Every structure is written in structure tokens, then in C-alpha cells.
Regions:
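Active-site loop-to-helix "anion-binding N-cap" substructures in soluble metabolic enzymes
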Residues: 1-250
């Protein structure tokens, strides 16, 4: 089945509004005619209005790095889906490894956020992946199955259609280590098989699974070119327009 790749930039906690606008102004002309893949930028919350305004009318979508599952309320420091949509955001990351690691985000919280995003019509990119100790203990498959199963509780096959999954081998994020294409493909197959078990073969065959773990211009082709890999969630290499352009045009 042909799946349109998504190349996504996770800017994490980098860039000022001026730097973000400069990036978009430089980047858009580089990819203006690029229709093979979808492109999305995920800046930090304070940058969302600036980036969305700068990217308006282009082929580049903009989303949040994190959202809260509540409609509104006394949740200091959080961003609601209503707020995201009010400024024009269309996507959101959910359950990024740094959210799980530093902010105690559990599979149950990921599940609540996924339900909320789908209810609002925001495209969710659900992040899953194992840490180094889990990989070395041979628990990669177990961890991925647990995270997928936990995230998808109560999700119907029909509701699941917009969902994107991003596989992040946590041991390869910001470490300079990269999963080989073979390791990445193996993980993607585990994820797709688990989705098939939960939601059916048709949904699994259509669902996009991105790779996210030290993706750079020099390894993008080898990774995204794999049949099982439907794009990339890019960190550090997405912070410069020319670097991210090379990945988009893998």
C-alpha cells in the first residue's frame, strides 16, 4: 500500500520568534514545489502563532510538541487543543520520549491525549520507543507492544485513520548513535503488526510509521527509503533550513 511520507521537524526548546520566522522565510522557497511528501514543523508553544502565520498558504503544516487532554482548566503551563486550533495548528506530537522521561508521561496519559486530539480533528503523531537498557535486555518488542496497546485503548479502527506513529529508539536520540535501517525496519514491523492485531490489517497497512532517532541529511535516504518507513521525526538536523531541506528531499 502506498503511504505518503511525513517529514516532521521537532524543534524542541530552541529558537526565538525572530529565529523561527527567519527559518520559515528561508525554508519555504526551498520546498515550495515539493509535493511527494507532507512536511510539518513542531515548534515550542510560544512560537506557534509566529510560525503558523509565516507558513500560511504554504505546503508546510504546523503543530504542537505537546497538548493537554482537558478542554480547559487549571493546568498551569499546559496548552489545550482549543488553543492550538485557535492559532491554526493542525498536528500534535503525543508521548515524545522526553515527555515520558522528564515529565512522567505514562501510556494512560498518552491514551487520553490521543482521544482528545482525535475528537478535535488534530492529527496526532504518537511517539513510542525503547531506552538503551531495554534494548540491551532484549525487551524492544515487549516495550513497543506495551506502549502501542496502552496508547490505543478505546480507539476504534475508524477513529484511528488519522493517527501517525513515530518510532524513536531513545538510545539514538541526541547521542549520535543511529539505528541501522535494518534495526529500524524490524521495529516498524513490530509496531505495524501490533496495530494490525488491535485495529485490523487494513488500518495497519495504511498507518504511517515515522522513524525518529538522529536523522541527518547523510542517513535520511537509507532510512526513509525503506518500504516500512513512512517518513521521519527530525530533531537537531531540522533546526537549519538547508539541513532540513536535504532530509525532506531524501
Amino acid at each position: 500500500m502506498s503511504r505518503k511520507a511525513l517529514i516532521a521537524a521537532n524543534w524542541k526548546m530552541y529558537k526565538t520568534p525572530a529565529e523561527a520566522k527567519a527559518f520559515v522565510d528561508a525554508f519555504l522557497p526551498l520546498v515550495a514545489s515539493h509535493t511527494r511528501d507532507e512536511i510539518a514543523l513542531f515548534p515550542s508553544p510560544v512560537l506557534l502563532p509566529t510560525v503558523i502565520e509565516a507558513a500560511k498558504g504554504s505546503n508546510v503544516a504546523v503543530g504542537a510538541q505537546n497538548i493537554h487532554f482537558a478542554e480547559e482548566g487549571a493546568y498551569t503551563g499546559e496548552t489545550s487543543l482549543n488553543q492550538l486550533q485557535a492559532v491554526g495548528g493542525t498536528h500534535t506530537l503525543i508521548g515524545h520520549s522526553e515527555r515520558r522521561q522528564y515529565f512522567a508521561e505514562t501510556d494512560e496519559i498518552v491514551n487520553k491525549k490521543l482521544h482528545a486530539a482525535l475528537k478535535h480533528g488534530v492529527i496526532p503523531v504518537v511517539c513510542v520507543g525503547e531506552v538503551l537498557a531495554e534494548r540491551e535486555a532484549g525487551k524492544t518488542e515487549e516495550v513497543l507492544k506495551t506502549q502501542i496497546t496502552g496508547a490505543f485503548v478505546g480507539i476504534t479502527p475508524e477513529a484511528a485513520k488519522p493517527i501517525v506513529i513515530a518510532y524513536e529508539p531513545v538510545w539514538a536520540i541526541g547521542t549520535g548513535k543511529t539505528a541501522t535501517p535494518e534495526i529500524a525496519v524490524e521495529a516498524h514491523k513490530i509496531i505495524r503488526a501490533e496495530v494490525a492485531k488491535l485495529l485490523g490489517a487494513e488500518v495497519a497497512a495504511a498507518m504511517r510509521i515515522l522513524y525518529g532517532g538522529s536523522v541527518k541529511p547523510d542517513n535520511a535516504t537509507a532510512l526513509i527509503g525503506q518500504e516500512e518507513i513512512d517518513g521521519a521525526l527530525v530533531g537537531g538536523a531540522s533546526l537549519k533550513p538547508d539541513s532540513f531541506e536535504k532530509i525532506v528531499k531524501y
